UniProtKB/Swiss-Prot annotation:
SMART domains hit by this protein: SecA_DEAD, SecA_PP_bind
Species lineage: Bacteria, Bacillati, Bacillota, Bacilli, Lactobacillales
Disordered: region residues: 780-839
Function: Part of the Sec protein translocase complex. Interacts with the SecYEG preprotein conducting channel. Has a central role in coupling the hydrolysis of ATP to the transfer of proteins into and across the cell membrane, serving as an ATP-driven molecular motor driving the stepwise translocation of polypeptide chains across the membrane.
Gene Ontology biological process: intracellular protein transmembrane transport; protein import; protein targeting; protein transport by the Sec complex
UniProt protein name: Protein translocase subunit SecA
Length: 839
């Protein structure tokens, strides 16, 4: 272990020596740049662009370009990047993560690699965790970029598509991580090229990269459309039922936060819903509602997992930042179950039209880099998932903060008494204090206790995060007491007020350890910026969530020996700190495994999504007749239909092929079984294809010009692709839930998901081509079709998709359940295109 640690340290030192060498070269240009006039310095941007066009690489331009930005920052902002900031900028340009402590000037550090990469003209995205930071950084640092002749855009959720397009077309675009992701998904749902807003993804520099790429990695971005639902009463009934249960009627597994009915609970459910057997197959839907109601009532906690807004909306609370996640909903009906629990309006369930995880979203950039003060603990994940190294950057001044040993109390009550007493003592002498909590509930509790103690303070949590930047900015003033949920206000520096250094600087008090060491380090890092004095102190109790769920037997045995009889007894031990860290490592390992599994599943969809989106983009951007593509689909559809009956009785095969041709290709009277008998399969395929081509030409002749033909072809393909893709996403989601159970049968769920997902994708492609063929051949096309197509193109909304899906099923001829499907798939009608009708 010691050898491994030594090797890691030596590697870091070697990397720092390389960075320092390049940084010195950047510094060597300082006098030269300082001697230039404003006009000459500004002219360097055009010079760099020309040199890049002539073949110089960005790496060759780096020393001089970084020097230009340093001088520009000095003239425009009055700030001159230190050597350690230059080193951080080099790491960012290389597509890695410089670990820079709080207050070391990460925002200024980013200006150098952002400027350099913008020279290539392919766009640079600076990603922040909220719109306040996007707007702030774009406004402040944008002055430097604009002065140097680069355009800067801010992408906000409220902007129109035209405004977003303008922002993305700038050299540098500031945006939140969620908005970039949603814009990508929406771009792949439009039916006209002019409605797209993004350019190809080039370089992303992510601020607070651990928050975006690690903490939010488990939460997919989902674009969904409403699906009419009559199930609200079931949510309410299930909620009413579980509220009648006592603690013996359900079983909770605390470490995994799962819950299920006990035997007595099952008996009560069967009695309540008048069932003979709750787990009969026809009751599967009901058990799903009951499971969600159990989770909502006994696992999901108000003010910890979610809050209820003033207008009665359930808002998810991000467990890592303490902020509410606007627009996000718990999936799989859990959100509706919580709405039933809290007695607010139950919103309709939705059907996913497009989704992507942050992991796969950001891996699509040509180059990805990020900044944070705390990433070393997640180094393995950054390397394996994103191919990014973590390079710790030295501080410009030595850290003067004192980190005190953790204090452990027997109960929550005794711990909070000690916290209030500590705050009272420090506040009396004027020392500013930041109290960090992991939940809104704890913030409110401590706030009430401080009010009782007569201590004025500010509370910063998920309920008032609009004021968070202002509150955090004042947290370093003399006598200030601030309670902050987790890492609320992250990204805003706490600067010490006058006379505070002499009082010991800002004191950070942690009210419990978070399950992630990184979050604890972030809280500590709010104090002691740029060599300022400061202190940190964590208070723990045996009743803390982390200690209850993951406290080891060694801790319990140690505490038994200490005989904690007195409620206010406190333990201060290095061994305790090591055991807590060990528990945190276990949790981090569990969370990493979960994120890894999410990625493995999403990688299956990623490959399929990229194929669909690439083909979609080809259709949207095509300014030509798409006839060759449609004819190829027709040919493959005919081939599949004929091949599906190759092994059947010859008479039955011919009859089935004729049925397929009449329902999907040609007018009913234009083909008969008689003319196909005696022909070989290849001859039948060719005959049907030639007939289909004649019909195809007849159909297009009804459109008045080439422009109308191209528009009709595009809308036809895109509408069908979008319908089938939406259905496929839903099917993959159901498959994922189903294969999860196969782990109990010693089968690898991910491998099964990959295999079955691939087969389903092939089936979907066949279904797309069949629907394009049938619609092309059978559609009633009139002269005004172009106007109708154009109108449909501007309203490609999920509700249109729903009606289109219904229309497709209704167009099928009357076929009995167990007959072969006329699409030629070889499946029974009830298992193919008839599935939706019968369901």
């Amino acid at each position: 272990m010691a050898n491994i640690l030594r090797k890691v340290i030596e590697n870091d030192k070697g990397e720092l020596r390389k960075l320092e060498k390049i940084a010195k070269k950047v510094e060597s240009y300082a006098d030269q740049m300082a001697s230039l006039s404003d006009r000459d310095l500004q002219g360097k941007t055009l010079e760099f662009k020309e040199r890049y066009q002539k073949g110089e690489t960005l790496e060759q331009l780096l020393p001089e370009a970084f020097a230009v930005v340093r001088e520009a920052a000095k003239r425009v902002l009055g700030l001159f990047p230190y050597r350690v900031q230059i080193m951080g900028g080099i790491v960012l340009h290389n597509g890695d993560v410089p670990e820079m402590r709080t207050g070391e000037g990460k925002t200024l550090t980013a200006t150098m690699p952002v400027y350099l990469n913008a020279i290539a003209g392919e766009g640079v995205h600076v990603i922040t965790v909220n719109e306040y930071l996007s707007t702030r950084d774009a406004t402040e640092m944008g002055e430097v970029y604009s002065w140097l002749g680069l355009s800067v855009g801010i992408n906000l959720a409220a902007k129109s598509p035209a405004e977003k397009r303008e922002a993305y077309n700038c050299d540098i675009t500031y945006s939140t991580n969620s908005e970039v992701g949603f814009d990508y998904l929406r771009d792949n749902m439009v039916v006209r090229q002019e409605d797209m807003v993004q350019r190809p993804l080039n370089f992303a520099l992510v601020d607070e990269v651990d928050s975006v790429l690690i903490d939010e990695a488990r939460t997919p971005l989902i674009v969904s459309g409403a699906v009419s639902s009559e199930t609200n009463q079931l949510y309410i009934r299930a909620d009413m039922f579980v509220k009648t249960l006592t603690s013996v009627d359900y079983v909770i597994d605390v470490p995994t936060k799962t819950i299920g009915l006990s035997d007595s609970g099952i008996d009560k459910a069967e009695s309540y819903f008048n069932l003979s057997n709750l787990y009969d197959i026809e009751n599967v839907a009901l058990t799903h509602f009951i499971d969600n109601a159990l989770r909502a009532n006994y696992i999901m906690l108000l003010d910890i997992d979610y809050v209820v807004s003033e207008d009665g909306e359930i808002l998810i609370v991000d467990q890592f930042t303490g902020r509410t996640m606007e627009g996000r909903r718990f999936s799989d009906g859990l959100h509706q179950a919580i709405e039933a629990k809290e007695g607010v309006r139950i919103q309709e369930e939705s059907k996913t039209s497009a989704s992507i995880t942050y992991q796969n979203m950001f891996r699509m950039y040509k180059k990805l880099a990020g900044m944070t003060g705390t990433a070393k603990t997640e180094e393995e994940e950054f390397r394996e998932v994103y191919n990014m190294r973590i390079i710790p950057i030295p501080t410009n001044r030595p850290i003067a903060r004192i980190d005190h040993t953790d204090l452990l109390y027997p109960t929550l009550e005794s711990k909070f008494r000690a916290v209030v007493e500590d705050v009272k003592t420090r506040h009396a002498k004027g020392q500013p204090i930041l109290v960090g909590t992991v939940a809104v509930e704890t913030s409110d509790l401590i706030s009430r206790k401080l009010v009782e103690a007569g201590i004025p303070h500010e509370v910063l949590n998920a309920k008032n995060h609009f004021k968070e930047a202002q509150i955090i900015m004042n947290a370093g003033q003399r006598g200030a007491v601030t309670i902050a949920t987790n890492m609320a206000g992250r990204g805003t520096d706490i600067k010490l007020g006058e006379g505070v250094r002499e009082l010991g600087g800002l004191c950070v008090i942690g009210t419990e350890r978070h399950e992630s060491r990184r979050i604890d380090n972030q809280l500590r890092g709010r104090s002691g910026r740029q060599g300022d004095p400061g202190e940190s102190q964590f208070y723990l109790s045996l009743e803390d969530d982390l200690m209850r769920r993951f406290g080891s037997d060694r801790i319990k045995a140690f505490l038994d020996r200490m005989k904690l009889d007195e409620e206010d007894t406190v333990i201060k031990s290095g061994m305790l700190g090591r055991q807590v860290e060990s528990a945190q490592k276990r949790v981090e390992g569990n969370n990493y495994d979960t994120r890894k599994q999410v990625l493995q599943y999403d990688d299956v969809m990623r490959e399929q999504r990229e194929i669909i989106y690439a083909n979609r983009r080809d259709v949207i951007t095509a300014n030509r007749d798409l006839g060759p593509e449609i004819k190829a689909m027709i040919k493959r559809t005919i081939d599949r239909a004929v091949d599906a009956h190759a092994r059947s009785n010859r008479k039955d095969a011919v009859d089935a092929i004729v049925t397929f041709a009449r329902t999907s290709l040609v007018p009913e009277e234009s083909i008969s079984a008689k003319e196909l008998r005696g022909l070989k399969d290849e001859q039948i395929k060719e005959k049907l294809y030639q007939r289909a081509l004649a019909i195809y030409d007849q159909q297009l002749s009804k459109l008045r010009d080439q422009e109308a033909i191209i528009e009709f072809q595009k809308v036809l393909i895109l509408m069908i692709v979008d319908n089938k893709w939406t259905e496929h996403i839903d099917a993959l989601d159901q498959l994922r839930n189903a294969v999860g159970l196969r782990g109990y049968a010693q089968n690898n769920p991910v491998v099964e998901y990959q295999a079955e997902g691939f087969k389903m994708f092939q089936d979907m492609i066949g279904a797309i081509e069949f629907d394009v063929t049938r619609t092309m051949m059978k559609a009633q096309i009139h002269e005004q079709e172009r106007e109708r197509a154009s109108q449909r193109a501007t309203t490609a909304a999920p509700q249109n998709i729903q009606s289109q899906q219904s229309a497709n099923t209704d167009d099928l001829p009357k076929v009995e359940r167990n007959e072969a499907c006329p699409c030629g798939s070889g499946k029974k009608f009830k298992n193919c295109h008839g599935r939706k009708s019968f369901s």
